[in-house]
């Protein structure tokens, strides 16, 4: 293996407005969420494996479906990826989104791309919603991509925005 990349993303606590970010609600009413990132993380590793040069991507470890979807979307020949976390599954902390953001970041760096936090959040959400058909909102991906807190947004169809720096932890 050559050129291994590691990235991590935090989970979040939803303080107010949960589920107002899940379509179709925000398109009709506008949603507002206050979430704060916490010190529980998903860590993703991605690498090129010369022995896998003809494979589009191989998933290794936990979160196999999400990892495989991220690899398909990245389209990096010979890439392998794995993701682990230090929080329990289905804990209501936005864990799959943290995994998705960490994977998106590691795979982007493996390609030599520098994505913005907003681009990482959008890519992670698109992978979950479009590839895996998981209906979901925006807050988890944006909290994982931006970290800190609070993350407050409105009119999610236009993406998410972090709160002003003066409000961030």
Predicted features and spans:
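ATP-dependent small-molecule kinase catalytic core of the GHMP/sugar-kinase superfamily
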Residues: 2-6, 10, 16, 21-31, ...
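Anion-binding (especially nucleotide phosphate/pyrophosphate-binding) glycine-rich loop
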Residues: 3-6, 38-127
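Low-complexity, intrinsically disordered regions enriched in charged/polar residues
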Residues: 16, 32, 60-64
